[in-house]
């Protein structure tokens, strides 16, 4: 139920004056809001991850007022940094590297985050089948020459589609090469020398070999290829990517522009100057947010965006997504020798890739006795394809399998997961058939409708460097022009 005075009229009044008399409550969706519970801004950003924080800072720097609504207790989303309490050394559980582009360097300079070239700690890799703990004698093991040739050939194919460097902007009809399984694409053009490196840089996409090619190209754009083949990635100089979001919190917090532990429960999105209205449940009670524009910077899975007043077209498109599970645990007492990296492989699969769901890799960190363990699942319609407890149990089982099958190489210990981060739902994607039917053209056509803009990994890829570029070039100009 709405009050006798329409919500539209109230909203127009609010946008004009940004003040409601304290003794005259505004009733929206059956709730009464007094002035102290009404927040008026130019833009509301739903989602305080990498994309939401970035666009909020950009908007504030452009002189626009903004408020970020974040469901969790912190900003940063997929970014998570483990700090050892004894040594204060750190290890990343999410965002690790950046591209050396102006979109990255300008933004992080603005936040006073120094960057440095990446350096790799020496480690020795061993291949084991973590289903059994037994060693794997790889049958697929490309030479350095094959690796270089694979990426050179891939770059030549990628150059046919320069628009992919800006987003999933596809020619129509969509070429068959872009919708065929990625493994078949690499084989067709004799690019398999690059396959293992591509797989190891992009866990969490589900079945790597059967992904539609363009879904992998979203990640493997020209900047990523250049960084991987030259090793010229950047990292935060203090080895703490979470510091970015501490700084963002300071920037936005100075203008009371962040609502943590807060969740949208109701939204009204309209065309024209009426703008948008959101009811948000916060630790201090429900707040009414009134703004000219809305930015949605959370995964557009239906169970996530249901309260955001979706149109029929949005429901139809977002309902087509599948995603994969991607998980990172910090583990000690592994029994693995120091500076030893364990890659999960299989003797009986194409390219010796592991059978998912499974651990992908166990990577030694700069913290003595602590390994970062990465796990992933196959694609699923479910937003959380693999339950956290099941993933954790599989990590412990995998380590114990190594110990049992190789008592001469691994100490018999009781592994302990000391930090945990789930990145699910990860790498939202669609089928080849949906790509052929124009899914991405329809998706991008949503930008700006009903005073709403979108950014985040689904609109680009799980790579902050590329998300920030996409936001700077494809979202912000139109958004700012409408304010």
Swiss-Prot record:
Protein name: FAD-dependent oxidoreductase oblC
Cofactor(s) required, per the database record: FAD
Sorted UniProt keywords: FAD, Flavoprotein, Glycoprotein, Oxidoreductase, Signal
Family: Belongs to the beta-cyclopiazonate dehydrogenase family.
Gene Ontology molecular-function annotations: oxidoreductase activity
Glycan attachment points: 100, 137, 190, 240
Pathway(s) where this gene product acts: Secondary metabolite biosynthesis; terpenoid biosynthesis
GO biological process terms, semicolon-separated: terpenoid biosynthetic process
Source organism of this protein record: Cochliobolus heterostrophus (strain C5 / ATCC 48332 / race O) (Southern corn leaf blight fungus)
Gene: oblC
Organismal lineage: Eukaryota, Fungi, Dikarya, Ascomycota, Pezizomycotina
The keyword Ligase is annotated on this UniProt entry: no
Enzyme class, broadest EC rank: oxidoreductase
Enzyme Commission number(s) of this protein: 1.21.-.-
Cleavable signal peptide: 1-21
Function in brief: FAD-dependent oxidoreductase; part of the gene cluster that mediates the biosynthesis of the sesterterpenes ophiobolins, fungal phytotoxins with potential anti-cancer activities. The first step of the pathway is performed by the sesterterpene synthase oblA that possesses both prenyl transferase and terpene cyclase activity, converting isopentenyl diphosphate and dimethylallyl diphosphate into geranylfarnesyl diphosphate (GFPP) and further converting GFPP into ophiobolin F, respectively. Other sesterterpenoids (C(25) terpenoids) are found as minor products of oblA.
């Amino acid at each position: 139920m709405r009050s006798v005075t329409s919500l539209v009229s109230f909203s127009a009044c609010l946008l004009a004056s940004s003040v409601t008399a304290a003794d005259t409550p505004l009733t929206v969706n059956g709730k009464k809001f007094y002035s102290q519970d009404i927040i008026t801004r130019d833009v509301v950003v739903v989602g305080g991850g990498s994309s939401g924080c970035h666009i909020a800072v950009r908007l504030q720097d452009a002189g626009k007022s903004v408020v970020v609504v974040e469901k969790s207790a912190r900003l940063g989303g997929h970014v998570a940094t483990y700090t050892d309490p004894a040594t204060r050394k750190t290890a990343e559980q999410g965002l690790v590297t950046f591209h050396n582009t102006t979109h990255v360097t300008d933004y992080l300079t603005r936040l006073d985050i120094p960057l440095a070239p990446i350096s790799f700690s020496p480690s020795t890799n061993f291949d084991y089948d973590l289903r059994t703990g037994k060693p794997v004698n790889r049958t697929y093991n490309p030479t350095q020459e094959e690796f270089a040739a694979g990426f050179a050939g891939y770059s030549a194919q990628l150059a046919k589609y320069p628009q992919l460097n800006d987003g999933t902007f596809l020619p129509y009809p969509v070429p068959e090469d872009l919708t065929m399984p990625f493994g078949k694409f690499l084989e067709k053009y004799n690019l398999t020398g690059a396959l293992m490196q591509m797989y190891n840089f992009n866990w969490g996409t589900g079945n790597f070999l059967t992904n539609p090619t363009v879904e992998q190209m979203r990640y493997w754009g020209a900047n990523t290829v250049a960084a991987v083949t030259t090793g010229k990635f950047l990292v935060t100089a203090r080895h703490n990517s979470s510091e970015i979001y501490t700084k963002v919190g300071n920037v936005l917090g100075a203008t009371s522009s962040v609502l943590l532990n807060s969740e949208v429960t109701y939204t009204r999105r309209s065309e024209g100057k009426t703008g948008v209205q959101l009811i948000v449940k916060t630790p201090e009670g429900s707040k009414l947010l009134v703004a000219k524009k809305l930015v949605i910077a959370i995964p557009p899975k239906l169970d996530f965006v249901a309260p955001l007043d979706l149109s029929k077209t949005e429901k139809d498109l977002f309902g087509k997504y599948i995603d994969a599970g991607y998980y990172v645990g910090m583990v000690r007492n592994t029994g693995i020798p120091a500076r030893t990296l364990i890659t999960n492989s299989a003797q009986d699969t194409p390219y010796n890739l592991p059978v998912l769901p499974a651990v992908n890799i166990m990577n030694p960190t700069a913290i003595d006795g602590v390994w970062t363990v990465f796990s992933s699942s196959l694609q699923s319609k479910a937003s959380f394809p693999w339950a956290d407890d099941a993933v954790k149990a599989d990590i412990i089982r995998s380590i114990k399998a190594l110990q049992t099958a190789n008592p001469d190489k691994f100490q018999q210990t009781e592994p302990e997961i000391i930090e945990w981060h789930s990145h699910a739902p990860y790498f939202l994607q669609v089928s080849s058939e949906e790509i052929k039917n124009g899914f991405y053209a329809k998706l991008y056509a949503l930008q700006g409708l009903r005073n709403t803009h979108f950014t985040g990994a689904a609109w680009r890829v799980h790579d902050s460097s590329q998300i920030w570029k996409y936001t700077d070039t494809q979202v912000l100009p139109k958004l700012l022009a409408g304010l």
